Regions:
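Conserved amphipathic alpha-helical "coupling/scaffold" segments
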Residues: 1-154, 158, 263-266, 270-284
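SMC-family hinge/dimerization module
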Residues: 190, 194-225, 235, 297-320
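Extended, Lys/Arg-enriched charged tracts that mediate electrostatic binding to polyanionic substrates
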Residues: 160-203
Length: 639
């Protein structure tokens, strides 16, 4: 990676975006790794990185963000333990922190949520939790300065004896400091500790009146800290207990160190994987913070940013831009007013390309794509060097010379106010020649300029496109909208007129401008007016289209409702017709059965009074039932 490329990364402020990324990581190691990220020129690698970021976004959406707290680089400590070294409590706590983070990550991966396979699965599958060792360390070590009594039964026993012995010594010394015979020689009636031994503070002039061992003297020399002879044996026993305690603590630390060394390789792997996962999820959290999307990655030279936003410009004031490069043109000439957004446009193109090459989602709309460039070069900003006595023009030219030495077909070159700060005619000629050189190298180019000659150059040259940052002459304010295919026009006369400059002065100024320039600006003005009229017509057409769609939706809803009600009525009618059919069928069956019985009785010679009339009535009922049955069937057929 050459020096000029590194300078361009700085000018495009990639480091500031990486700093935002680092803010979304918790461990210092992950923050450092985020800051060390550099763009990749491998399209497959970039796609894989972006896929990882997207997968992490999905995980966060479904089941929240995992915790990576307690991650420390414990490799050196594990290596020392492997060689037989005894680790400090702080080192062991850091190892336990990695083990806890590994267990939590494993639990996160195995929890409910995302079901389908993900590129993150390989990372999570490499993690192995060791809850036994994790809890063993945390239960044994309370802090970097304190070992728990529960670390071993022997340590608990020793400390119990220490407390008992300390109480015994204090009790004996308490008798001395409360004795009236010693009241005059004591500086204070207290028991204190010096060199792990209990002592009492005695006035310097009375030190010979209390038999014992002197362990310390106050800075003023007025107080001697004396261990009375009656406490020597007790203090000796206490000292032996302290030595036994230290020995037991060393044994415990050595044991925990050895156990950690046994799992050295897995703990190292866990740390590496967790660190990578933390950086991936930091990328995902940044994506949410920026409302970013995963762009398409191309290698055919085509870049297309839809409603892209510069990630370092926050608030409601940011105006999205849509810009493309490499489809029907490989060079973009951007003109427009100062502070109108030209430089921001250049930076947005360059920075979003670099972000994607780092595996970061970009703040733009869906459908955006970036092209993979091996190097992105930018000549942006005033780098005038007083020490080198370089003018602004010379400083930029020196920078451009270095860029031209290394740019090629895999480069994106961004020029801000190309060849400004010198004679306009010569500056414009130089600018065109520099752009042509880059184009012959096959590089993609975007340049901002005030030179009218470059507008004409773009209009006459195949593969070169004009663009402009819109300016509202009525409000005298830039709108920050980027207009592809529309060259920027000079607004000096219009602005001066609105600000109240005398008409006579304006007319004289116009007469001093060449007729060709006047005609060119008039053409640009007409084009701009036509563009605005077309945009208004387009907006009106869009409004009418939306209204038509809204009316169509209402009509569709109305007809759907009518159809639903009709179907509901038909279903009810079918139910009623079916009920009539079923009822008629039951009635017919009853009539047939009764008629059958009458015929059977008549056949047997039995006399049935009124049987003829009864049979005739039954036949009429049967005919009525048949008619009802037929009409119900016809109704069902109609439905």
């Amino acid at each position: 990676m050459n020096e000029q490329y590194e300078k361009s990364l700085s000018k495009l402020e990639l480091d500031k975006v990486l700093s935002l990324l680092a803010d979304h990581a918790s461990s210092q190691a992950a923050k450092d790794r985020c800051m060390a990220i550099r763009p990749s020129a491998d399209a497959d690698e970039i796609r894989h990185l972006l896929e990882e970021t997207s997968a992490a976004c999905k995980c966060i959406t479904i089941k929240g963000s995992p915790s990576f707290g307690g991650l420390y680089d414990v490799g050196a400590s594990l290596d020392r333990a492997y060689r037989g070294g005894c680790l400090s409590p702080e080192e062991l706590l850091r190892i336990a922190g990695v083990l806890r983070a590994a267990r939590q990550a494993k639990s996160y991966a195995e929890g409910e949520g995302v079901q389908e396979a993900s590129v993150l699965d390989l990372y999570f599958q490499q993690i192995t939790s060791n809850k036994y060792l994790e809890e063993r360390i945390f239960n044994s070590i309370l802090s970097k300065d304190e070992i728990a009594d529960a670390a071993s039964s022997e340590l608990a026993s020793i400390r119990r004896k220490i407390r008992q012995q300390s109480a015994k010594i204090r009790e004996s010394l308490q008798k001395i400091i409360t004795s009236p015979s010693y009241a005059k020689i004591l500086q204070e009636p207290i028991v204190t500790i010096r060199s792990d031994r209990f002592v009492v503070p005695v006035k310097a002039e009375c030190k010979g009146q209390l038999p014992g061992l002197v362990h310390d003297v106050s800075s003023s020399g007025s107080t001697y800290f004396i261990e009375p002879m009656s406490a020597v044996n007790g203090n000796n026993e206490l000292r032996e207990l302290f030595m036994a305690e230290r020995k037991e603590i060393e044994r415990i630390l050595a044991e925990l160190s050895a156990e950690s060394a046994d799992h050295r390789e897995q703990i190292k792997l866990d740390y590496d994987v967790l660190l990578e996962l933390e950086c991936i999820f930091a990328r995902a959290r940044l994506s949410f913070a920026m409302r970013a999307i995963c762009p398409e990655v191309r290698t055919d030279g085509q870049l297309n940013l839809i409603r892209a936003r510069h990630p370092l410009i926050t608030g409601k004031t940011v105006v999205p831009i849509s810009v493309r490069l490499g489809s029907d043109f490989d060079t973009l000439i951007i003109t427009g007013p100062n502070t109108g957004g030209k430089t921001v446009t250049l930076k947005t193109i360059g920075l979003l390309t670099l972000m994607a090459e780092c595996g970061l989602h970009i703040p733009a709309d869906d459908g955006s794509s970036i092209n993979v460039y091996e190097q992105v070069f930018a000549d942006i900003g005033d780098e005038q060097s007083i020490e080198q006595s370089l003018s602004t023009f010379s400083s930029h030219t020196k920078n451009i010379v270095e860029i031209l030495k290394v740019c090629d077909r895999d480069s994106l070159v961004l020029f801000d106010e190309l060849c400004a700060g010198t004679d306009p005619a010569e500056g414009a000629a130089l600018a065109i020649a520099i752009i042509e050189f880059c184009r012959k190298c096959g590089a993609g180019v975007a340049a901002t300029t005030h030179y009218a000659e470059l507008k004409l150059y773009a209009m006459r040259t195949s593969g070169v496109m004009n663009a402009s940052c819109e300016f509202n002459v009525e409000t005298l304010q830039p709108t920050y909208r980027l207009l592809i295919g529309v060259p920027g026009k000079s607004n000096a006369f219009a602005i001066s007129k609105r600000l109240g400059l005398d008409d006579g002065i304006l007319e004289q100024a116009r007469s001093l401008v060449s007729q060709n320039d006047v005609n060119f600006e008039d053409v640009l003005t007409q084009l701009d007016q036509q563009r605005q009229e077309m945009e208004k017509a387009k907006e009106e057409a869009e409004r009418l289209r939306r209204e038509t769609e809204k009316q169509k939706e209402k009509s569709d809803e109305y007809y759907a409702q009518i159809k639903q009600e009709k179907e509901k009525a038909a279903q009810q009618a079918r139910k009623e017709a079916q009920f009539i059919i079923d009822d008629a069928r039951h009635a017919a069956d009853a009539v047939y059965e009764e008629l059958k019985q009458l015929r059977k009785q008549a056949k047997n010679g039995a006399f049935i009074p009124g049987s003829n009339e009864k049979q005739a009535g039954m036949r009429r009922s049967l005919n009525a039932v048949s008619y009802t049955h037929l009409r119900a069937h016809e109704t069902l057929s109609d439905l």
